[in-house]
Amino acid sequence: MENNLINEAIDKIKSLKVDIPIIAIVLGSGLGNFIHWIENPTFVNFEEIPGFQPSTAPSHGGKLIFGTFKGVNLCLMQGRLHLYEGYSANQVTFPIRVMRRLGAKNLFITTVSYTHLRAHETVL
């Protein structure tokens, strides 16, 4: 059943005639503006894709964005799901599995973190 749902999601995305992504990027909080650098973007709301769950965080877009950046085909995930929102691990990871099956060879998961370091201190 899981494979059928993944195939349905892929069929829906391919019906939109998007370029097959080489890289998938999950945009962390505060990084949503990266989409403005994408050339020829195609926006797909999670609700339009079989098996995708809605993003409940107000600042998360709940979209996949397909396009290019410096000549590389990308799939950006703007908004992500969390276990603490009540989603299962299977639901949280479903979009990642879809992006992989679409053709993404590399996955970058980003996040934003904050600190209370004094000026000129570095965290590695």
Regions found by a protein language model. Give the residues of each.
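Single conserved hydrophobic/aromatic residue that forms the stacking wall/gate
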Residues: 116, 123-124
